[in-house]
Amino acid sequence: MSDLYEKTYNPDVLSCLANLSNDEVFTPPEIVNQMLDMLPESIWNDPEATFLDPACKSGVFLREIAKRLDKGLEPIIPDREERIEHIFKEQLYGIAITELTSLLSRRSVYCSKYPNCKYSIVEFDSAEGNIQFHRCEHTWINDRCKYCGASKSEYDRDTSLETYAYEFIHINDPKDVLPMKFDVIVGNPPYQLSDGGGTGSSAKPIYQHFVDQAKKLNPRYLAMIIPSRWFSGGKGLDKFRSEMLSDDRLSRLVDFENFRDVFPGVDLAGGACYFLWDRNHHG
Protein backbone atom coordinates (compact mmCIF):
# COMPACT_ATOMS: atom_id res chain seq x y z
CA MET A 1 0.00 0.00 0.00
CA SER A 2 2.80 2.42 0.80
CA ASP A 3 4.22 1.84 -2.66
CA LEU A 4 0.81 2.65 -4.15
CA TYR A 5 0.68 5.93 -2.23
CA GLU A 6 4.23 6.73 -3.32
CA LYS A 7 3.32 6.15 -6.96
CA THR A 8 0.16 8.21 -6.62
CA TYR A 9 1.81 11.10 -4.78
CA ASN A 10 5.41 11.66 -5.74
CA PRO A 11 6.28 14.15 -4.38
CA ASP A 12 3.81 13.79 -1.52
CA VAL A 13 1.05 16.30 -2.22
CA LEU A 14 0.10 16.37 1.47
CA SER A 15 3.42 18.03 2.29
CA CYS A 16 2.66 20.81 -0.22
CA LEU A 17 -0.90 21.84 0.67
CA ALA A 18 -1.65 25.45 1.53
CA ASN A 19 -3.50 25.78 4.83
CA LEU A 20 -7.18 26.64 4.83
CA SER A 21 -6.49 29.37 7.41
CA ASN A 22 -4.52 29.90 10.61
CA ASP A 23 -7.38 28.09 12.36
CA GLU A 24 -7.66 25.00 10.14
CA VAL A 25 -4.09 23.87 9.54
CA PHE A 26 -2.94 20.87 7.51
CA THR A 27 -0.50 18.58 9.32
CA PRO A 28 2.81 17.77 7.60
CA PRO A 29 3.30 13.99 7.15
CA GLU A 30 6.57 14.06 9.12
CA ILE A 31 4.77 15.52 12.17
CA VAL A 32 2.02 12.92 11.83
CA ASN A 33 4.62 10.15 11.93
CA GLN A 34 6.33 11.66 14.96
CA MET A 35 2.97 11.50 16.71
CA LEU A 36 2.28 7.94 15.59
CA ASP A 37 5.74 6.93 16.81
CA MET A 38 4.49 7.59 20.36
CA LEU A 39 2.07 4.66 20.10
CA PRO A 40 3.25 1.17 21.06
CA GLU A 41 4.52 -0.97 18.19
CA SER A 42 2.03 -3.69 19.10
CA ILE A 43 -0.87 -1.54 17.91
CA TRP A 44 0.23 -2.00 14.29
CA ASN A 45 0.02 -5.80 14.65
CA ASP A 46 -3.52 -5.78 16.02
CA PRO A 47 -6.23 -6.50 13.42
CA GLU A 48 -8.90 -5.54 15.96
CA ALA A 49 -7.51 -2.06 16.71
CA THR A 50 -9.69 0.82 15.54
CA PHE A 51 -8.55 4.37 14.74
CA LEU A 52 -10.48 7.64 14.55
CA ASP A 53 -9.50 11.08 13.28
CA PRO A 54 -12.36 13.32 14.50
CA ALA A 55 -11.12 16.37 12.57
CA CYS A 56 -10.12 15.15 9.10
CA LYS A 57 -8.71 17.83 6.85
CA SER A 58 -6.31 16.14 4.43
CA GLY A 59 -6.64 12.50 5.53
CA VAL A 60 -2.93 12.35 6.33
CA PHE A 61 -3.37 10.72 9.75
CA LEU A 62 -5.49 7.88 8.36
CA ARG A 63 -3.21 7.46 5.37
CA GLU A 64 -0.08 7.10 7.50
CA ILE A 65 -1.88 4.73 9.88
CA ALA A 66 -2.92 2.61 6.89
CA LYS A 67 0.71 2.31 5.77
CA ARG A 68 1.77 1.06 9.20
CA LEU A 69 -1.09 -1.41 9.48
CA ASP A 70 -0.38 -2.76 6.01
CA LYS A 71 3.13 -3.67 7.12
CA GLY A 72 2.26 -4.77 10.65
CA LEU A 73 -0.62 -7.04 9.70
CA GLU A 74 1.18 -8.85 6.90
CA PRO A 75 2.04 -11.92 9.06
CA ILE A 76 -1.57 -12.10 10.29
CA ILE A 77 -3.38 -11.42 7.01
CA PRO A 78 -0.86 -12.48 4.33
CA ASP A 79 -3.15 -11.86 1.35
CA ARG A 80 -2.64 -8.19 0.57
CA GLU A 81 -6.00 -7.58 -1.05
CA GLU A 82 -7.76 -9.10 1.95
CA ARG A 83 -5.50 -7.14 4.32
CA ILE A 84 -6.18 -3.80 2.63
CA GLU A 85 -9.92 -4.51 2.57
CA HIS A 86 -9.84 -5.24 6.29
CA ILE A 87 -7.78 -2.16 7.20
CA PHE A 88 -9.93 0.34 5.32
CA LYS A 89 -13.32 -1.14 6.15
CA GLU A 90 -12.81 -2.34 9.71
CA GLN A 91 -10.06 -0.22 11.28
CA LEU A 92 -9.94 3.35 9.91
CA TYR A 93 -12.60 6.00 10.56
CA GLY A 94 -12.76 9.75 10.14
CA ILE A 95 -15.05 12.73 10.69
CA ALA A 96 -14.30 15.56 8.28
CA ILE A 97 -14.56 19.20 9.35
CA THR A 98 -16.06 20.45 6.05
CA GLU A 99 -17.49 18.96 2.88
CA LEU A 100 -14.35 20.06 1.01
CA THR A 101 -12.03 18.32 3.47
CA SER A 102 -14.18 15.18 3.36
CA LEU A 103 -13.50 14.94 -0.38
CA LEU A 104 -9.81 15.71 0.07
CA SER A 105 -9.49 13.14 2.86
CA ARG A 106 -11.18 10.42 0.85
CA ARG A 107 -8.98 11.22 -2.13
CA SER A 108 -5.88 10.94 0.08
CA VAL A 109 -6.93 7.78 1.90
CA TYR A 110 -8.88 5.83 -0.74
CA CYS A 111 -7.25 7.44 -3.83
CA SER A 112 -10.78 8.45 -4.84
CA LYS A 113 -13.06 11.12 -3.42
CA TYR A 114 -15.94 8.70 -4.00
CA PRO A 115 -14.95 5.35 -2.45
CA ASN A 116 -17.93 3.53 -3.94
CA CYS A 117 -16.40 3.74 -7.41
CA LYS A 118 -13.98 1.45 -9.22
CA TYR A 119 -11.03 3.82 -8.73
CA SER A 120 -11.05 3.48 -4.94
CA ILE A 121 -8.39 1.28 -3.29
CA VAL A 122 -11.30 -0.48 -1.58
CA GLU A 123 -14.83 -0.25 -2.94
CA PHE A 124 -17.44 0.75 -0.35
CA ASP A 125 -21.21 0.63 -0.65
CA SER A 126 -21.52 4.34 0.19
CA ALA A 127 -19.91 7.45 -1.29
CA GLU A 128 -18.60 8.36 2.18
CA GLY A 129 -16.74 5.18 2.97
CA ASN A 130 -15.64 5.47 6.59
CA ILE A 131 -14.92 9.21 6.36
CA GLN A 132 -18.14 11.03 7.09
CA PHE A 133 -19.27 14.63 6.94
CA HIS A 134 -22.63 15.85 8.17
CA ARG A 135 -23.33 19.56 8.14
CA CYS A 136 -24.14 20.87 11.62
CA GLU A 137 -25.61 24.10 12.91
CA HIS A 138 -24.77 26.06 16.03
CA THR A 139 -27.23 25.99 18.93
CA TRP A 140 -27.69 29.60 20.01
CA ILE A 141 -28.28 30.59 23.62
CA ASN A 142 -27.97 34.30 24.43
CA ASP A 143 -26.15 34.95 21.14
CA ARG A 144 -23.53 32.25 21.79
CA CYS A 145 -23.33 28.64 20.67
CA LYS A 146 -23.88 26.38 23.69
CA TYR A 147 -21.25 23.94 22.42
CA CYS A 148 -18.34 26.01 21.10
CA GLY A 149 -19.12 29.55 22.26
CA ALA A 150 -19.20 30.97 18.72
CA SER A 151 -20.70 34.43 18.32
CA LYS A 152 -24.12 34.47 16.66
CA SER A 153 -23.30 37.75 14.92
CA GLU A 154 -20.27 36.09 13.30
CA TYR A 155 -21.55 32.59 12.49
CA ASP A 156 -25.33 32.73 12.01
CA ARG A 157 -24.95 32.43 8.26
CA ASP A 158 -26.72 31.68 5.02
CA THR A 159 -27.01 27.94 4.34
CA SER A 160 -24.69 28.30 1.35
CA LEU A 161 -21.80 29.33 3.62
CA GLU A 162 -19.65 27.23 5.93
CA THR A 163 -20.97 27.21 9.51
CA TYR A 164 -17.79 26.08 11.29
CA ALA A 165 -20.06 24.05 13.55
CA TYR A 166 -17.92 20.93 13.74
CA GLU A 167 -19.90 17.73 14.19
CA PHE A 168 -17.67 16.09 16.80
CA ILE A 169 -18.03 18.95 19.29
CA HIS A 170 -21.61 20.03 18.57
CA ILE A 171 -23.25 17.19 20.41
CA ASN A 172 -23.42 16.20 24.06
CA ASP A 173 -22.34 12.59 23.61
CA PRO A 174 -19.75 11.92 20.86
CA LYS A 175 -20.89 8.28 20.79
CA ASP A 176 -23.94 9.56 18.92
CA VAL A 177 -21.69 10.61 16.02
CA LEU A 178 -19.99 7.23 15.64
CA PRO A 179 -21.48 4.63 18.00
CA MET A 180 -18.45 2.40 18.44
CA LYS A 181 -15.32 1.99 20.55
CA PHE A 182 -11.97 3.30 19.36
CA ASP A 183 -8.56 2.17 20.48
CA VAL A 184 -6.77 5.24 19.11
CA ILE A 185 -8.04 8.76 18.51
CA VAL A 186 -5.59 11.03 16.75
CA GLY A 187 -5.74 14.34 14.92
CA ASN A 188 -5.16 18.05 14.53
CA PRO A 189 -8.40 19.85 15.42
CA PRO A 190 -9.44 23.35 14.35
CA TYR A 191 -7.91 25.83 16.76
CA GLN A 192 -10.17 28.84 17.18
CA LEU A 193 -13.11 30.90 15.99
CA SER A 194 -13.48 34.64 15.73
CA ASP A 195 -15.36 35.96 18.76
CA GLY A 196 -16.24 39.23 17.08
CA GLY A 197 -13.14 40.97 18.38
CA GLY A 198 -10.62 39.80 15.81
CA THR A 199 -8.36 36.85 15.20
CA GLY A 200 -5.14 35.48 16.63
CA SER A 201 -4.78 36.10 20.36
CA SER A 202 -8.27 37.66 20.54
CA ALA A 203 -10.04 34.68 18.93
CA LYS A 204 -11.90 32.04 20.93
CA PRO A 205 -10.10 28.69 21.26
CA ILE A 206 -12.08 25.55 20.44
CA TYR A 207 -9.41 22.82 20.21
CA GLN A 208 -9.92 21.94 23.88
CA HIS A 209 -13.46 20.78 23.07
CA PHE A 210 -12.08 18.16 20.67
CA VAL A 211 -9.74 16.84 23.38
CA ASP A 212 -12.57 16.73 25.93
CA GLN A 213 -14.94 14.95 23.53
CA ALA A 214 -12.25 12.42 22.59
CA LYS A 215 -11.68 11.60 26.26
CA LYS A 216 -15.41 10.91 26.65
CA LEU A 217 -14.96 8.05 24.17
CA ASN A 218 -12.34 6.55 26.52
CA PRO A 219 -9.89 5.30 23.88
CA ARG A 220 -6.77 3.38 24.81
CA TYR A 221 -4.68 6.19 23.34
CA LEU A 222 -5.35 9.80 22.40
CA ALA A 223 -2.82 11.90 20.49
CA MET A 224 -3.48 15.42 19.22
CA ILE A 225 -1.46 18.41 18.10
CA ILE A 226 -2.79 21.74 19.39
CA PRO A 227 -1.60 25.27 20.19
CA SER A 228 0.46 25.56 23.39
CA ARG A 229 -1.37 28.62 24.68
CA TRP A 230 -3.32 26.45 27.11
CA PHE A 231 -0.12 26.25 29.19
CA SER A 232 -0.84 29.73 30.55
CA GLY A 233 -4.64 29.44 30.70
CA GLY A 234 -6.97 32.37 30.11
CA LYS A 235 -9.40 32.89 27.22
CA GLY A 236 -11.63 30.08 28.51
CA LEU A 237 -8.74 27.61 28.89
CA ASP A 238 -8.29 27.64 32.68
CA LYS A 239 -10.43 24.54 33.27
CA PHE A 240 -8.77 22.70 30.39
CA ARG A 241 -5.31 23.62 31.69
CA SER A 242 -6.13 22.40 35.19
CA GLU A 243 -7.55 19.11 33.91
CA MET A 244 -4.61 18.45 31.59
CA LEU A 245 -1.98 19.16 34.23
CA SER A 246 -3.71 16.98 36.83
CA ASP A 247 -4.43 14.07 34.45
CA ASP A 248 -1.90 11.33 35.24
CA ARG A 249 -2.83 9.59 31.99
CA LEU A 250 -0.95 12.28 30.06
CA SER A 251 2.15 10.22 29.37
CA ARG A 252 4.04 12.45 26.92
CA LEU A 253 4.05 16.11 25.88
CA VAL A 254 6.24 17.55 23.11
CA ASP A 255 6.36 21.35 22.86
CA PHE A 256 7.55 23.65 20.08
CA GLU A 257 8.13 27.28 21.08
CA ASN A 258 7.65 28.57 17.54
CA PHE A 259 4.50 27.55 15.68
CA ARG A 260 6.34 27.87 12.37
CA ASP A 261 8.72 25.08 13.43
CA VAL A 262 5.80 22.70 13.00
CA PHE A 263 3.61 24.51 10.49
CA PRO A 264 5.70 26.67 8.14
CA GLY A 265 3.88 29.81 7.10
CA VAL A 266 1.36 29.72 9.95
CA ASP A 267 1.50 32.61 12.41
CA LEU A 268 0.00 31.77 15.81
CA ALA A 269 1.48 33.07 19.03
CA GLY A 270 2.47 30.68 21.80
CA GLY A 271 3.85 27.71 19.88
CA ALA A 272 2.41 24.25 19.34
CA CYS A 273 2.50 20.92 21.15
CA TYR A 274 1.44 17.36 20.69
CA PHE A 275 0.69 14.87 23.44
CA LEU A 276 -0.07 11.24 24.15
CA TRP A 277 -2.84 10.38 26.58
CA ASP A 278 -2.67 6.74 27.65
CA ARG A 279 -5.71 5.31 29.44
CA ASN A 280 -3.61 2.82 31.39
CA HIS A 281 -0.77 5.19 32.27
CA HIS A 282 -0.61 6.53 35.81
CA GLY A 283 2.48 8.66 36.24
Question: Residue spans of the language-model regions?
Answer:
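SAM-dependent methyltransferase catalytic region
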Residues: S2-V262, G271, D278-G283
